[in-house]
Each structure stands twice: as structure tokens, then as C-alpha cells.
A protein has these predicted regions:
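Catalytic-loop region of hydrolases
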Residues: 23-106
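Short, surface-exposed "cap/lid" segments of acyl-processing enzymes
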Residues: 87-96, 100-148
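Accessory cap/linker subdomain of secreted extracellular hydrolases
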Residues: 35, 41-49, 238-339
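C-terminal catalytic histidine-bearing segment of alpha/beta-hydrolase fold enzymes
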Residues: 330-331, 357, 361-412
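C-terminal motif of bacterial Sec signal peptides marking the signal peptidase cleavage site
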Residues: 17-20
Length: 412
């Protein structure tokens, strides 16, 4: 599914923002976390110097791998490596990303910015989209933002990609689905982009799908504590992975969908990378263990044959080895679940009534908790649509309204 996810999630956002739209890397090492994870929803302790260095650009280049035939004529792009913070430990992290600017002259106040959070691609260093000519499927979505007059600040997330000057071994692990780190990486990408391209405005909207939807939402929640110096106007989350703890019950009962089964090794390895109490052998069996390298890889030749594995999946391949192992996994995923904090930033959540990756009831329960906290959320359920959905003109109009200063409305 991860291979399909790349195309799917690019397609979601490519379709969603257009008003006229119609319907070989080795596996991440296990148990490499420094200690058992004790995840807190609060801000981590961050050293004064590291706090001041957020968004600092280590390097940037206008010599990029991107396919400019997919972008509006006259657009510009830079890759960048910048500093951010781990949401788990508060330690500094080095992250790769990119900034794209539309053709022409910026409007007064600078180009409005889309902080773009990509969807699930994987958990290994070969999964950094900004090393790929088509951003692993996101290039069309970026092009649409540029055509609408927005600059795009794009993050790979810590642990995905190989930042210049750092070895693969020194690169941080990607804490898949951990919301604070991803939120910090996105906010710091906007900071870094404004350094690389001074013509960018401080005003921005967060946008993402699936894992990126969770990231956009988390950026809104932690913006008050972390986002100083920029002006986040709203966060648009498509099919967001707000709370994936329900995967555990499905794994126990051997009822994971095919899409969820593709996702499952990334969930396990992403947790194991930061928590030594997660033993991957407790969760990955059969095809999921034997072909894990293929399932985790993002690029050929390592990823070749990923789609064909679906016919070999057995429900028991993902079943936790004990009730204790199941409870441990459930606890970790519950600790990651959004909402984590109330937010004053307006939120848009669009999700599919037939989603086979993130069932709509999971999304609705999470949004209910956020509504109870007093968040302003516009909740849109698209009946008959799945993890790849088409919200038509709604998304683009909602984003335009945020930049125009139109008061946001919710339907909690």
C-alpha cells in the first residue's frame, strides 16, 4: 500500500485544491530507542540554544532533482537542510526539505505560504520525497499550489531523507505517527523557507493528507507554544491519521484491511526505532517479517514486488504474540493520538465514509474529543469516498478564505 499511498496521497491533494476538480534500503533496526518510551503530550524541555536555532538553514541549493516540466513555467525551487527539534526528547534534529515559489513578482507582504505535510511514504532514509524528481508523487500537488499563487514549504520529516553532511547512520530515526516531531518539522520548514526565499510572507496555512493530515492538525495544536515568528491561519487535514490505536484490535482479530496491513510494518518499525520495549518480532510474522525489507522500502529495486505481496497476506501475520504485547502497542499508539492540546487555530477535516485505511468512525471519535476541547473544526464526511477522496472546490476555497481573513466557522 505504501507504493500505492504515494500515488494516492499525491492524487488526493492534486485533486483537492483545484476548484474545477472532478471526481534498496535495509529495514529500520529494531529496538534502537535509547529507553522505553514514556510519551508526554506536553512540550518537551528544549535547551535555549536549540530553541533559538529552530528553522536555521544549514544548507540550501537551487540545483534540485525536481521535474520542472510538472511545475508552472517560471517557478523556482530550492532544496534545504534545516534544524528542528524532536518532539520526544527535545533534542535538536536535522531535517531535509524544499521551498517552491510561484512565477512572477510576490504580492505586497510576500508570497502566502502553504506548509505542506506529505502523507505516508515509509520510515527509512530512502523515503525522503525531496530527493525524488516527482516528490514521490507530490509534484502535481505542489504545482497546483504554485498555480494558485502560493509558495510551498515542504518537509521530509526527521529520519526521512539524508540531510547533506550527515551519514545515514547519524540520521535520526523517523518516529512515524508521532505528532509533535512532525509538527515541529513542518513549522520549522516554514521558518527555513523564509530564510532561503526572503520574499515569503509570515502568513501560512498547513495542509496535509493521511500522515500529513495528522501533521497539519498537530501543527495547529502546538503552534501557540512553538510557532513564534510566523502566523498560522489554519490547518487543513485530509483523511488524517488522528488516532490509529484501533489497528491493534484489528490485528488481534486478524481483520486488518489490505491497506492497513501494508501500513502496519511502518507503524511497528517507527515505534521500535524510538522505544526499545517494542520488539518487532511480537508483531510481524509470516510475509510481514519475511518480506519486510520490500514492504518498508520506498524506491526500486528494493521496493519491487510490493504490490504483489497483497495476495500472500495472512491475517495472523500481524497478530500480536501476547495480550501484553497488544496492550503495549495500543498504549503507544493511544499516546500519539490527536487531539493532544486545544487550539485556537481553525481546522478543516475532510474524510471518506468508505476509507479502508482510517475508518471514518476512528476519525469521528477523535474529532469529537477535539470539539469537546472547544476547537473550531469544519468536519466534512465524503460518503462513498475512501482514503483517496475528491473534496472538489471546498478545500481550495477554505484555504483562500483563511488568507483573505474570512472568519472560520465550525460544525462541532
Amino acid at each position: 500500500m505504501i507504493a500505492r499511498f504515494v500515488g494516492r496521497l499525491g492524487g488526493v491533494l492534486a485533486c483537492a485544491v483545484v476548484a474545477a476538480c472532478s471526481a534498496s534500503q535495509p529495514a529500520a533496526p529494531s529496538n534502537t530507542g535509547p529507553e522505553e518510551l514514556n510519551y508526554s503530550r506536553e512540550m518537551p524541555t528544549i535547551a535555549t540554544g536549540d530553541l533559538a536555532a529552530r528553522g536555521t538553514v544549514a544548507s540550501s541549493s537551487d540545483q534540485t532533482p525536481f521535474d520542472f516540466s510538472e511545475l508552472p513555467a517560471g517557478s523556482t525551487a530550492h532544496t534545504m537542510v534545516y534544524r528542528s527539534i524532536s518532539g520526544i526528547t527535545g533534542a535538536p534534529a536535522v531535517v531535509s526539505g524544499a521551498v517552491f515559489t510561484p512565477p512572477g513578482d510576490p504580492p505586497p507582504g510576500g508570497w502566502p505560504v502553504i506548509g505542506y505535510a506529505h502523507g505516508t511514504v515509509g520510515v527509512t532514509p530512502d523515503c525522503g520525497p525531496t530527493a525524488d524528481s516527482r516528490l514521490l508523487g507530490d509534484i502535481t500537488s505542489v504545482a497546483i499550489q504554485l498555480n494558485l499563487g502560493y509558495a510551498v514549504a515542504y518537509t521530509d520529516y526527521a529520519g526521512l531523507g539524508k540531510p547533506a553532511g550527515s551519514s545515514q547512520d547519524a540520521a535520526p530515526s523517523h518516529a512515524y505517527l508521532e505528532p509533535k516531531s512532525a509538527a515541529f518539522n513542518l513549522i520549522d520548514a516554514v521558518r527555513a523557507a523564509r530564510t532561503v526565499v526572503p520574499q515569503l510572507s509570515s502568513r501560512w496555512v498547513a495542509l496535509g493528507s493521511s500522515q500529513g493530515g495528522e501533521t497539519a492538525w498537530a501543527a495547529a495544536e502546538y503552534f501557540g507554544a512553538y510557532g513564534q515568528g510566523t502566523d498560522l491561519l489554519g490547518a487543513a487535514a485530509l483523511v488524517p491519521t488522528l488516532d490509529m490505536s484501533g489497528l491493534v484490535q484489528r490485528a488481534e482479530s486478524s481483520t486488518l484491511t489490505a491497506d492497513q496491513t501494508y501500513l502496519y510494518p511502518n507503524v511497528i518499525e517507527g515505534l521500535a526505532a524510538v522505544d526499545k520495549s517494542i520488539n518487532t518480532n511480537d508483531y510481524l510474522h509470516g510475509v510481514l517479517r519475511d518480506d519486510e525489507k520490500t514492504l518498508l522500502a520506498c524506491l526500486p529495486p528494493a521496493s519491487a514486488g510490493k504490490e504483489a505481496l497483497a495476495s500472500r497476506f495472512n491475517g495472523s501475520d500481524a497478530k500480536p504474540s501476547s495480550a501484553e504485547a497488544a496492550d503495549r502497542l495500543r498504549d503507544r499508539l493511544t499516546s500519539y493520538a490527536l487531539p493532544q492540546q486545544p487550539t485556537k487555530i481553525p481546522l478543516l477535516a475532510i474524510y471518506g465514509g468508505s476509507d479502508q485505511t482510517v475508518p471514518p468512525e476512528w476519525t469521528e471519535v477523535a474529532m469529537g474529543r477535539a470539539c469537546a476541547r472547544g476547537d473550531t473544526i469544519l468536519r466534512i464526511r465524503m460518503e462513498g469516498q475512501g482514503h483517496k477522496l475528491d473534496p472538489g472546490a471546498l478545500l481550495g476555497q477554505w484555504i483562500a478564505d483563511r488568507f483573505a481573513g474570512v472568519p472560520a466557522v465550525g460544525n462541532c
